[in-house]
C-alpha cells in the first residue's frame, strides 16, 4: 500500500489541495521512486498557492519536472524533455501492489503534460521564468536564470576585448617558455600568448597535456612585465585540488630554465587556495562581491569542470574589470555536483577564440591514451582492445598485474554475470596488502617509526624526508568507487580494510593505530584543514597524530582533535578529482542500471593514475557506463562572441 500511504501523507501537507487522481498518483509515484522530496513538493505547493487560484494543480506536475531536471545538474528544463524526465523519474522495477504498471504510469504522465504546460504558462514571470530558444522553450527557476544571465554576460564582456597589453615579443616568449629537458608545443605557446592579451581564457586538456606548464610560463611572462605577486591568486574548487595546483607549479618552477633567483623565489611562494577561501565567508554573504572586488589582476582557477553555476557567478562578480581570469580544466571529467557545467558549455563552443585546447599528453602511453579516448567516445570494442585482462577468479591477479607490463597501462577485471562479493573482498584486501596499507606493510612501518616523535615534520611543520616518504607511500595507490554505500562503495570497502588492520575487529576508533589513511570532510580553517584533505595517522609526540601534506609543509593534528573525517583506504571518484595516484583501482557498482554509471566517472577514475589503473566490475556495468554521458542544460551561451 505504499502509493496509497504516500498520497495520504502528501495530503496532510496540502499537496495538492485538490487535483485529479492522476496528479496525486504521479506525485506519489515520484516520491516513492525517490526522484523528488517532500521538501521540494512543499516548495511547489508554496509556488502554486502564491498564484492565488490562477492555476490548477497540474502545475505540480510541471514543477516536479523542473525539480527533477535541477537534481540532474541542469539549470533549466526544456519543455520537450519534461515527459521523459517524469517517466524515467517514476520508473519502479517492482511496482507496489496498489500502483499501476510502468507503462500505465507513462501514459498517465503523457495525458497530464498538456495541462501541466498550460499551468506553467500562467505561473511564468515570477518564481519560474520562460526563455524562448530555437530548440525549445527553456524554463528556469528565477535564481538559476539570474545566474545564467550574469555568467553569460560577464564572460562575454571579458572575452570580447583585449586588455591593452602588447603581444609578447619573441624575446619575452623565449624567456617565459624555457624549461629544462622539453619545449612547449604550439598550442601551449598560443595559450601563453592569449593569456597575456585577453581578460578571459579557457585552457582545456586531459591529464599530462601541460596545463600547469602553461600557467608557469604565463606567470613568468606577466611577472616580467611587473605584475605584482600579491595581485595573483591561484584557486580551485576543493582543498585538495588547490593544494595539488601549488605543488604542480613548484615542480614546473624547478624545471624552469633561465629563471632568475628573485622570480623563482616568488613563484615558489604561490599556493593554491579554494574558491570559497578566495571569496571569503560563505554564500550568499561573501566578503568579496560586486560591491567589494578582490584586489587582484590575475586569477587562475584549476579543475574548473567542478565549478557549479552559482559559484562561478560569485567568482566573476568579485573580479575587478581589469583582472584576467584563466580557467583550466578537462571537460571530459565529472561536472560539478551542483547545478551547471559551465566549463563544458564554453569548451563545447566551436572555434571559440577564448578557448585553447591542449591535446598532446606526456603522462600517458599510447595504450593508456587509447583507453581514455575509448571511454570518452563510448566505444566498448576500442576499450577492450586498449586494456589488458585480469581474471577475476585468479588469486594471483596482482602478480600478473605487475608481470604483464610495468606501468602506463589500463586493466579490466570483470566478473561474468554478477559480481562475487567474497572474491571482491579478497581482491580489495590483496590490493591494500600489496601496497603496504595492512599488517607490517611499508606505509604502516613508516608511520610507526618512533623517531617521528622528534621529526621536524611534527615539531616545525616542515616536509622532512620521513614525512615525504610517508606521503609518497600513501599515494602509491587508492581504491576509487562510483558509489558511497554498499559493499562496493566507500563505506563498505573502508570498513572491510580497517577491520583487517585491526585483526578482523571493527574498531570504535580507527585512529588509535598508525598508518590509517584519513580524509577531512569539513572545512576547518582554524586547524588549517579542508574538505578533501587526505592524511595518515603516525606515531606522534604524545600519542597518535594525523599528518597532512601542504606543499613543502606539513599540517599536523592530534588524532583526538581531528575535525569531521572518514577513512580513506577508498574514496569516491568525485572526491579524487584534482588528485593523482601511482596506481588506482576503480570499482563499479554491481547494478548496471545505477544512475551514477557514466563515461565521465570511468574517465575521471582511470585518469587519476600515473602508472596503472584497473577497473573491477562486470562487463555489463562497463557497457552501461560507456553508453551514458552526462549532458547538462545550463543555458550559458557566449555564441555571439565566437
Task: Please place each PLM-identified region on the residue numbering.
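Intrinsically disordered, low-complexity N-terminal extensions of AAA+/P-loop NTPases
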Residues: 1-97
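Short mixed-charge
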Residues: 93-101, 253-267, 444-467
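Interdomain "pre-motor" coupling segment immediately N-terminal to P-loop NTPase/helicase cores
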Residues: 98-168
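Conserved pre-motif I regulatory segment
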Residues: 172-200
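ASCE P-loop NTPase helicase motor core
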Residues: 189-192, 196-402
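Conserved helicase motor core of P-loop NTPases
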Residues: 332-518, 524-527
